[in-house]
Amino acid sequence: MTLANKTLTILIALFPLALFAQEEKDSAGITFSGSIESNIHIPKYDEAIETEHYDDWAMTNTYANFDMESRYVDAGARFEFLKHPLPGYEEGFRGWGVPYYYIKGKMKCAELTLGTFYEQFGSGLTLRSYEERSLGIDNSILGARLVLNPLKGMIIKALTGKQRRYWGHSDALLTGVDAQQTFPLTRSLDDNHPSLTLGASYVNIHHPSQETLEGEKLKRNVNLFSLRSTLNIAPVTLYAEYAHKSNDPSATNGYQGGSGKAYIFSAKYEKDNFSLLLRTKRTENLLARSERTQTGLAARVNFMPSFSEFYADYDLSSSFPAPQPESEQAYQAKMTYNFPEGTMLGGKYGTSLTLNFSHARSLHKDEGGTYYQDISAIIDKKINEAFSLKFLYINQIYNATVLDDGDEKVHNNIFITDATYEFNERLSLNADLEYLTSTYYEGDWLYGKLSLTVSPHWTFSVSDEWNCGETKTHYWYGEVEFSAGSHELSVGYGRVSEAYICVDGLCRLDPSMKGLFVSYNYEF
């Protein structure tokens, strides 16, 4: 019997506990909740933008979550249908079933979960198990997790299980423990009072088979540990973390092996109208997987946070500054100042200014140099009661040799104007105009979008993305969005250009597409 079957059998056996809890409704307070998310694409071939030919007349990523909560017992499951997945997702995710299910027992100072769960230790340098549907990431753990709160300010976590890999699970067994203690520097543990938080984590990856490389046996156990601390003395917050990984030859590091390490330092100042963030990190051979031969986004045990700024609301600002866990030194400095109302620069309604500098490079001068650099300025200004403006300038450098399949360093300049006019409480119009100058082979791009919102239910938008450099191709698109209560529905038709979708420093490539796009979300 597989681990999944064993766990499912246990859940079925324990589920009557949840039903029994209904008899204690007055004291237990049972609640049911869930959600449905369905994204559908009906493709149409377009030779002009080189869309792919698909065997499926329609493709969808559909998810349905069901959860029950009570005073002592929680339970839930998620159904997924990706038998015909959306373009750009890894082929391994093709399938359907119930990969996520759990039952959780809760007491005053303890919590035990059996089944599937997500977890993160610290910033994720030793363990980050999470779901990111836009990228096709789900590295949940099937097994058991215990969370203890024995003392005020103390959290202890212990877990064991196997990591999800597409529709199965990796052979390696993960075992980990994390401990964190917050010490008040005054008599209060309130978030606004000075405090010192110390944490430590340990993760073991046990590979059951004795793999060999060039005749040499690889060690079955890979160990990761980290130490971290947070000092909070308002308005200053300081954070530091160090992580270490034992010898781990894998496809990620070219089976070179050797130990890995990383550190993160950050300092944040935030008071009144001013905030400043300074941080740096260094990573070397730290990425660990539950399958040594795996590449791509699957079977990742830990996580390398990105120190690059993301401008997710804007079309032409997307790039792919994915952290390089084998060799990277990164820095970021970000400042925000809100000019007060009634001042010369603040005007009647105030003005916000944000400046950012991000830089990531190789640890070795002969291995790629600069990976990515971002210098940006954002001005957000409300002109009057009805009209507001936002201006962005972004200067980017990215190394296409390292981050993409190119062979050059690409220089981008991006200019964005975002304007919103509110005619009344129900009707508003948003205009987004973007221009990208680039040394990339396709050259410059121009993007424009108009969105009319009729509150509380409707939004109508039209856009065009035009390659005014090499191809002269237009990517026009129209969309209608409707929302009512817990329901959200959007229907769009048109062309979508090839682009990288990035979240938290991890990316996947979305191919050029044309056709009908439908998205539906419901929460209950």
Question: Residue spans of the language-model regions?
Answer:
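Signature for the C-terminal beta-barrel architecture of outer-membrane proteins
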Residues: 24-31, 36, 40-59, 68-69, ...
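Catalytic domains of carbohydrate-active enzymes, especially glycoside hydrolases
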Residues: 63
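Phosphate/ribose-recognition catalytic cores of enzymes acting on nucleotide-derived substrates
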Residues: 100
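Bacterial Sec-dependent N-terminal signal peptides
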Residues: 1-31, 524
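Long, intrinsically disordered, low-complexity segments
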Residues: 485, 492-494
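Well-ordered mid-protein domain cores that form the structural environment of catalytic cofactors
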Residues: 103-125, 129-150
